[in-house]
Curated annotation (Swiss-Prot):
Domain of life: Bacteria
Family to which the UniProt record says this protein belongs: Belongs to the major facilitator superfamily. SotB (TC 2.A.1.2) family.
Residues that span the membrane, as ranges: 15-35, 50-70, 81-101, 103-123, 136-156, 170-190, 209-229, 246-266, 275-295, 299-319, 333-353, 364-384
Topology Cytoplasmic: residue spans: 1-14, 71-80, 124-135, 191-208, 267-274, 320-332, 385-396
Gene3D superfamilies documented for this protein: MFS general substrate transporter like domains
Membrane disposition: Multi-pass membrane protein
Protein name: Probable sugar efflux transporter
Periplasmic face of the membrane: 36-49, 102, 157-169, 230-245, 296-298, 354-363
Job description of the protein: Involved in the efflux of sugars. The physiological role may be the reduction of the intracellular concentration of toxic sugars or sugar metabolites.
Places the protein is found: Cell inner membrane
Annotated keywords: Cell inner membrane, Cell membrane, Membrane, Sugar transport, Transmembrane, Transmembrane helix, Transport
GO cellular component entries: plasma membrane
């Protein structure tokens, strides 16, 4: 009995450490959203010009997720995690030392390389290390780490950037990663690669129309979200005319609302996943369409950000659950593709927001983002009606 209890405690400790790692990786991806103005001021650039860094990061992840996953498919997972954390930490040290915007971008590319591998293996590792019968809870913990990156990571990173400079934000993330690495070295056993899939898995996955439809839905809805979200900090200050402190509070509110979305999905996701995702996309559409009208009031923007955060968490969880259900025989390949496709959406959205801000007006980012959100809503209704069973159950 004691051995089993200890074993379960150790198993949960391993999953929690992975969740902390997920928090750190997502924090570093999201945190530039709250630092764009400070970085732009530091390098004497326009905010919209600095925003291209978001697109470069996301598209490097998108481009390298599958190749890196395939290159490392036979590598023992503990060793792989240690190596990618070393790259991650070294890249953050370079971010801290960046003497030009070009060097900062190079350092972010290094982080993106580590990110590309991490997210292709994390979900399957969490499932493997979870106590018996607790796989869903293990995935929920990883999702919580992801949500907390927006709830705590991004706002804290912005606060550190405001008071100590944006370089210290990246340095602090590097320190957090170092501590997490030491915990992983201490806790993780040898983890031989399992069910990672290979190039042979790709034709099999591509022949699953339900899975391909989910991938398409993912890229469109993420593009919609990041068209506006990437520039929400300068939007709040320059368009709405509110303070930097309110921008921080708004990011905290939006991220915190993600926890509510996670709870809602945890309660209803098993039975009503498709309906939840479509409803969340509709909610995202409304939030984007009302972004500019809501900019005349702090209360209006605050309420809107709550619904926005709830919607995006449900969408993110719903997409991940469906991908895992539709590719149980090649989870690493499927999740590498998902990570790549998700980041194509991030990069595309950030680029669209960049172009709208530079050549039109930053005030229009919500309206422009609403266009792909509407397309995503229509597509979700179509595919969930066409594959109502396939999307809820595992295929073999």
């Amino acid at each position: 009995m004691t051995t089993n209890t200890v074993s379960r405690k150790v198993a949960w400790l391993r999953v929690v450490t992975l969740a902390v790692a997920a928090f750190i990786f997502n924090t570093t991806e999201f945190v530039p959203v709250g630092l764009l103005s400070d970085i732009a001021h530091s390098f004497h650039m326009q905010t919209a010009q600095v925003g291209i860094m978001l697109t470069i990061y996301a598209w490097v992840v998108a481009l390298m997720s599958l190749p890196f996953m395939l290159m490392t498919s036979q590598v023992e997972r503990r060793k792989l995690l240690i190596c990618l954390f070393v790259v991650f930490i070294a890249s953050h040290v370079l971010s801290f030392l960046s003497w030009s915007f070009t060097v900062l971008v190079i350092s972010r590319i290094g982080v993106a390389f580590a990110h590309a591998i991490f997210w292709s293996i994390t979900a399957s590792l969490a499932i493997r290390m979870a106590p018996a019968g607790k796989r869903a809870q293990a995935l929920s913990l990883i999702a919580t780490g992801t949500a907390l990156a927006m709830v705590l990571g991004l706002p804290l990173g912005r606060i550190v950037g405001q008071y100590f400079g944006w370089r210290m934000t990246f340095f602090a993330i590097g320190i957090g990663a170092l501590i997490t690495l030491l915990c992983l070295i201490k806790l993780l056993p040898l983890l031989p690669s399992e069910h990672s899939g290979s190039l042979k898995s790709l034709p099999l996955l591509f022949r699953r129309p339900a899975l391909m439809s989910i991938y398409l839905l993912t890229v469109v809805v993420v593009t919609a979200h990041y068209t506006a979200y990437s520039y929400i900090e300068p939007f709040v200050q320059n368009i709405a005319g509110f303070s930097a402190n309110f921008a921080t509070a708004l990011l905290l509110l939006l991220g915190g609302a993600g926890i509510i979305g996670s709870v809602i999905f945890g309660k209803l996701g098993n039975q009503y996943a498709s309906a939840l995702v479509s409803t969340a996309i509709a909610l995202l559409l409304v939030c984007l369409a009302l972004l500019l009208p809501a900019a005349n009031s702090e209360i209006h923007l605050g309420v809107l950000s709550i619904f926005w955060g709830i919607a995006m968490m449900i969408i993110g969880l719903g997409m991940q659950v469906k991908v895992l259900a539709l590719a149980p025989d090649a989870t690493d390949v499927a999740m590498a593709l998902f990570s790549g496709i998700f980041n194509i959406g991030i990069g595309a959205g950030a680029l669209v927001g960049n172009q709208v801000s530079l050549h039109w007006s930053m005030s229009m980012i919500g309206y422009v983002g609403a266009v792909p959100a509407f397309a995503a809503l229509i597509w979700s209704i179509i595919i969930f009606r066409r594959w109502p069973v396939t999307l809820e159950e595992q295929t073999q």
